[in-house]
Structures are given as structure tokens and as C-alpha cells.
Amino acid sequence: MDTFQVIILALIQGLTEFLPISSSAHLILPAQLLGWEDQGLSFDVAVNTGSLFAVVIYFRNELWAMFKAWIASMVKGQHSDDSKLAWWIILATLPAVFFGFIAKDFIETHLRSAGVIAVTTIVFGLLLWWADKMSRRDLTVYQTGWRKALLIGFAQALALIPGTSRSGATMTAALMLGLSRDAAARFSFLMSVPVSLGAAILVGKDLAESPLPIDFQALTLGTVISFVAAYLCIHYFLKIISRMGMTPFVIYRLILGAVLCGFIFL
């Protein structure tokens, strides 16, 4: 890949990973518009790692508090709001791990198409709009509970379908279950840590076994750009939804879905 391609794809990953607008929908656009080939496994690992670093550093205080409380809950039997939240995040991760393991090959073979991505981008955009407008939205992350956490986890598993958007599906479910916009976003972001870490380990294992050469300069640049873009995205997204809700992202998803349909059918 040339430098321009690295910059564009890393920006797309960083900006779309944590917004409810589907990163997979955006990653196929350069291929459609510019005829770019697949960026490769090593680049996917690099930009995903950059996004993972961004959410870990942004929520470092919350994650550290949760980790300490989680350890205390196991070692000393001391339970607190942070330890409960940590257990809920772990519980919410399990459905994606299970369904990802059994359905990975089917999804890669049958669902990773522009048509599927276009439809899911539109459909789940409308569901996000409904959840944002019709739900109660007054619970904090510490009021989630294990049942709601598990249901949000199933929504995350549903996001294995390309175009759904992991953050979009989890925020939609959280809003439907009564979490506030800020709480829905924060729970979704915290959920991304174990999922992204697990995915990076699995893909990294495949990469280590691959005989293909590695362009370390491109990977380093992609990681840094993805990190910066994702960090800024998280920061400003939390500010935007507190003022404007999810409507701007719903409108954007509908437009994006229409554009993808145009590429497919015109």
C-alpha cells in the first residue's frame, strides 16, 4: 500500500470503529470508488490495535478502577459498583465469542457482500433512531444489571453481520433497555476492549503463521493514525450525543446505505 492509502484506511478505521455507522460499510467504499485491493491481514491488526489503545487510554481511570474492583471481588469477596460493572462487561462479551467462533466461516463466505452491508446499514440505522426516540434513557452504567448486559451482548453478537456496526447495535440495545445516551455509549466502548483484544490476538496468530512480507513502516503509520482518530472520535462523540442525540448518525447511515445501493444497482 502507498502512504495515501494507509492514511485514508487508518482514518476510516479510527473514525468509524466507535461511531454507530459501521466501519465495514466504509471500508468497502474505497474499493468501490478507487479500485483498491484488500488491505491485508497485517494492516487490519495494526489499525485495530490503534483503536484498542485509544479506548483503553481514554477510559484508563474507569478500566483501572474496574480491574482493581474485579480482582478484589474474586480474592476478597468485596463487591462494588465497579466490580459488578466489570463482571457485566465480561458477561456481555460471551455471546460474541460464542457466535463468532461457530459462525465466522459462514459470515465471511455468505454475508460479507456490498448488498448485505447496504441493507444492514439502513435497517439498523432505523432501529437506532427508534431506540433513541422511544426509549426511557435514564439508567447509568452502574444500573445495567446482568440481564441487560447479556442482552446487549447478544446485540454485539448480531453485529458480526457486516454493516450492522458493533457500536451501533450495542448502543441501540442499551437505549432500548433504558440506559441514557451517555451510559449506552460508555458501556459500548468498555465492551469493545475485551472483544478487540481477543480479535487482535486471534488475527495476530494468523498473521504470525502467514508467509507474506510485512511492511512495518505502513503498519506503524496506520496504528498511529487510527489511534489519534479513534481517541478524538470517542471524545467528541460523547459531547455530540449529549446535545443532539443519535439523529445525525441515523441520517448519515441512511445516506450511506443509499449510496451503497446506488453502487450495487446502478
From Swiss-Prot:
Major localisation: membrane
First-tier enzyme category under EC: hydrolase
Molecular function as annotated in GO: undecaprenyl-diphosphatase activity
Record localization: Cell inner membrane
Keyword field: Antibiotic resistance, Cell inner membrane, Cell membrane, Cell shape, Cell wall biogenesis/degradation, Hydrolase, Membrane, Peptidoglycan synthesis, Transmembrane, Transmembrane helix
Recorded catalytic activity of this chain's protein: di-trans,octa-cis-undecaprenyl diphosphate + H2O = di-trans,octa-cis-undecaprenyl phosphate + phosphate + H(+)
Cross-referenced Pfam families: BacA
Function: Catalyzes the dephosphorylation of undecaprenyl diphosphate (UPP). Confers resistance to bacitracin.
Family to which the UniProt record says this protein belongs: Belongs to the UppP family.
Other comment: Bacitracin is thought to be involved in the inhibition of peptidoglycan synthesis by sequestering undecaprenyl diphosphate, thereby reducing the pool of lipid carrier available.
Protein name: Undecaprenyl-diphosphatase
Organism: Shewanella sp. (strain MR-4)
